[in-house]
């Protein structure tokens, strides 16, 4: 059974990231993942997309993604999130960042992510 785009994005944030489930990351990431930013796009192979998650986790003692808002598009492929992310770095520094991302999910796998960056602080 193929998961809905919303289910994939929620699993990616709440299970892959929040529970360090890298096996699920392997299942949810596409053959290639295009990460869009303003002015540039980076295409990651499947292996690079999974390694990016593992490598990011190595910088933190804890990191959590709280999804303040999840909006699934009518096309069945796009999902937008507003998130808050409390984290603790390896040196014990604690901080919060917030941002928005839009995901494209095809056949149950994340194939594209749009992110214009994050900002330190908490959503008001």
Model feature map: region roles:
Residues 1-124:
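C-terminal and inter-domain tail/linker signature
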């Amino acid at each position: 059974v193929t998961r809905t785009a919303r289910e994939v994005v929620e699993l990616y944030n709440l299970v892959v990231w929040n529970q360090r489930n890298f096996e699920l990351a392997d299942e949810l990431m596409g053959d290639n993942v295009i990460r869009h930013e303003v002015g540039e796009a980076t295409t990651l192979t499947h292996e690079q997309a999974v390694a990016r998650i593992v490598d990011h986790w190595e910088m933190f003692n804890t990191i959590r993604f709280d999804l303040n808002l999840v909006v699934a598009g009518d096309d069945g492929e796009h999902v937008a999130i507003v998130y808050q992310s409390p984290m603790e770095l390896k040196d014990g520094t604690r901080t919060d960042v917030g941002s928005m991302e839009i995901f494209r999910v095809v056949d149950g796998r994340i194939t594209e992510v749009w992110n214009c960056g994050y900002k330190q602080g908490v959503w008001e």
